[in-house]
């Protein structure tokens, strides 16, 4: 819809979804995929943020560049971002179950100040995690991981931290 509204090219920060057919279709109608905003030569063109979400600094950078942006963050990802913010405001330290360098993890971790969220990828990470005297700990998960993908990690977290706060359903 953005290409129809604005005409090509429309820039997209990261592949908007992990689905080659969709990405190729968008390229064919004038979408140009970039990793960072500074790769966009014509800042008068709009940019779309992918369904995975982006760190808070990205919309700020777009505003500073005077770029129009469209936030296509998946509603489920936005829910995780809001939950992270609410937990942070309630003085929880947050553990994010996810995969290092996944765009969604980067976006979620970028919602809060550095050090507010620690990434947990494996049961071994749980075993090695040192609680830095946080009074309250909560966990959230990357939305693209299934309950089966995270079950062993969640079980390990609950064993290590019996009072850990679970995500809002």
What is the role of each PLM region?
Residues 1-169:
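The feature marks the mature, well-folded catalytic cores of soluble enzymes
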